[in-house]
């Protein structure tokens, strides 16, 4: 996270994207079922691109670096969604305990991450209060969805092995 946000704030978002590519490569190499994990990462990337672009188009966020197509979220924020998704079946596995826990974690953690990113210049919160509330609501909905998908994909290989 730090490498991506700091490099984006410094106007060199490619550095963070390279760090994400290396981390994701190592993660996939260590996975029992990389195919299922890739599906999770692709869904997270798509979800992230759509959500972050909606925030940009709504005028709530402005990014100064990494814009590939005007009106869309920068590539580095999509890379962060992919990086975050790599934690769902590992370090963030505790979110599986309940949908409410995942919703609260997303509702608090999402805005905090954006506040931190804005404080170092990676993103501008155009209307800070409205932006942070919107981000909190979005993450409170999306994190439980990502957790459920992670569970489904993580457990799918076990079902195949048991039926064989």
What residue ranges belong to the model's regions?
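Aromatic-rich, lipid-facing transmembrane alpha helices and their immediate juxtamembrane interface loops
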Residues: 1-164
